Amino acid sequence: MFAQYSNRREFLKSGGLSLILLLNSCSNVSKKVNFALQNSFLPDSFKDIIPFAWKQNKINFGSNNLEKNRNIILDSDFTLINDGWISTINFSQFNEINESYFSEILDRRSKDFLNSFEVNQRNKLFPIGLVPYAIIIKNNKDLVSSARKSWNFLLSRKLTKKIIFPESPRVLISIAEKINSSDALAKLKSQAMLFDDQNILNWLINSEACVAIVPYSLCSKYLKIDPRLSIVFPKQGVPLIWYFVLSRSNLSSEILIDWIKSLESKSTVDKLSSEGWYIPFNTNYIQSKYKAEMHHNLGPSKLCWDNSWSFPQLTNAQKIKFENYWNNLLIP
C-alpha cells in the first residue's frame, strides 16, 4: 500500500487531503436546504411535496416589512414567488437556472410568458405552477349557466353590492375588458361589496355576498364542506397567476432538479390539479389536465385555458398609473 508513496509524510498528506474532500462532500449533502415562500396562498397538496428536510422560511410579500423579507430571501437557497410580486425582487442577487433540463421540460405557455421578461430576468425564473382564477357562486344555480358563457353576468342587477373582487386593479380591469358593455369597469365597481385578497371566501360564506372571484388554489377545501358553493370557469377565459422558483444556492443543481422531477409523477399532478395548481411542463399527462371538456367541474375547460391571460411585468410608470387608477376607483 505504501509503495505508491515515496515516504510516510507524503502518504499522510494524501490521506489528509482525501479526508478533507470527504468531509466537504458530506457537508454539501447534509446541508439543510432553505426555501423561502409565502405558504398562506399555497394549497395543501403543494406544501406536502416540499421535501421534509428542507427548512421553510416564511415570507409575506403583502406586508410592509420588505426589509425582513429581503433578509429571509438572502438567507435562503430557493425562493418561491408569484408574478404579482416579482417587481420586489432584486434579480442581481439570484443565479441563472436555465439549464438544458429546465428549458426542455417547460411547455409552450410557460415559454411564451417567460419571453415577456427581460433576458436577465427570464434566465433566473423557473415556472413551477399556474393557478387560474375561479368564480365561486353561492346559493344561485341559475347564475352558473350564464357565468360559464361569459363575464357579462357580473353586471346583473341581482348582484349589485354582492360581489367580492380581488384587491388587484389589473385583474379587475382585465375582466372589465371581457365584458360587452360601455364603461364596464365603473359598472363592476358599483357591483362590488368589497375588495379583498386575504379572507375572500370567509366573506362569501358569512355575508350577503353571492359571488367571489378567487384563485382556484384557495377554493378546494371550501367547495368540499359547503354545498351552497358552485365553481365556474367562463369559456371567455380567466386571469392566471404564475409561480416561479429562483435560486441563490451554492448547492448542486441536482438538488433542485430532483425535486422538480418529483412534480411530474401522475399522483402528484392529480393532487395538485385537484386543488387548483397546474404544472406548466410539457409531458403528455400534465398537458391532459389542460384539455378538459366544457362544463367539466374539476377545473377550466380547454376552451377556457385557450382564452385565459397572463399579466406581463409593468414599467414603473405603468405601475404608478395603475395605482392611481385603482385609488380613484375606490373613492365613492
Residue ranges and their predicted role:
Residues 254, 262-332:
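Extracellular/periplasmic juxtamembrane helices and adjacent flexible linkers that interface
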Residues 83-89, 164-236:
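Ligand-binding pocket segment of bilobal, Venus flytrap-like solute-binding proteins
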Residues 97-108, 125, 227-239, 248-250:
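Short beta-strand->loop
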Residues 76-78, 94-135:
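A structural signal for short loop-to-beta-strand junctions that line the ligand-binding cleft
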Residues 143-159:
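Flexible hinge/capping segments at coil-to-helix
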Residues 134-142, 240-256, 262-263, 271-272, ...:
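A bilobed periplasmic-binding-protein/Venus flytrap-type ligand-binding module shared by bacterial periplasmic
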Residues 2-19:
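N-terminal secretory signal peptides and thylakoid transit peptides that target proteins
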Residues 27-91:
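Early extracytoplasmic/lumenal segment of secretory-pathway proteins
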